[in-house]
Amino acid sequence: MERVLIVNADDFGLSKGQNYGIVEAYRNGVVTSTTALVNGEAIDHAAQLSRELPALGVGMHFVLTLGKPVSEMPGLTRDGLLGKWIWQMAEEDTLPLDEIAHELACQYQRFIDVFGREPTHLDSHHHVHMFPQIFPIVARFAAQRGIALRIDRQTVLNADDLPSDLRSTQGFSSEFYGEEITEACFLRILDASAHRGEASLEVMCHPAFVDNIIRQSAYCYPRLTELEVLTSASLKAGIAERVYRPGSFLDI
């Protein structure tokens, strides 16, 4: 059985080093798709690069934890900035859901304004769209617009509540991250997905060249390691041996 493999590079637009790393992993590696932070410092640079690569699927990386929001969000920001306190607010069930829904729509429109087209799909920075309070908002939004959504099915409390017309891959993995960034890890992800009988799989990654912005990230030099692995000839061969067809979210 032929299976669709989407290797999605998160954080397009975060920095020029991130952008160049993603483009390198697409041109000379196994990356097939990316998602962009519309409030990133290098988002215009990302859009410019994407126009030179029309086959690269570009989705939207919904941001609620970094930088300035596109709309006014007094209930979520501190000193006008987004941050990781969103986790505590989620635990306390004090998230400003109306503001979040409005910000999602505003970021979506900003994406269209910057890239000149709709995104191929939605996911989010730090997976905040998988919060139980936020997921229904994002799932409904994606279904209404007919675009796909990254779904980590291990964290969805009730898959029966998903909109019937919502598109996603059958499998998703965030395991290619952190301390174990190896070809062996990547190929194990594919083998496990095949064992589960999934016809489509998304593997998340963050390839980048290190620059001053990336140095400020808690996840810095592993991004460069990811780039090295994702552009290796042996990884390409291993994927081909497993009868996976490279694709984007337009293929599901």
Swiss-Prot record:
Pathway: Glycan degradation; chitin degradation. GO terms for biological process: chitin catabolic process; diacetylchitobiose catabolic process; polysaccharide catabolic process. Mg(2+) binds at residues 61, 125. One of its GO terms (molecular function) is deacetylase activity. The keyword 4Fe-4S does not apply. It holds the Pfam family YdjC. Belongs to the YdjC deacetylase family. ChbG subfamily. This is Chitooligosaccharide deacetylase.
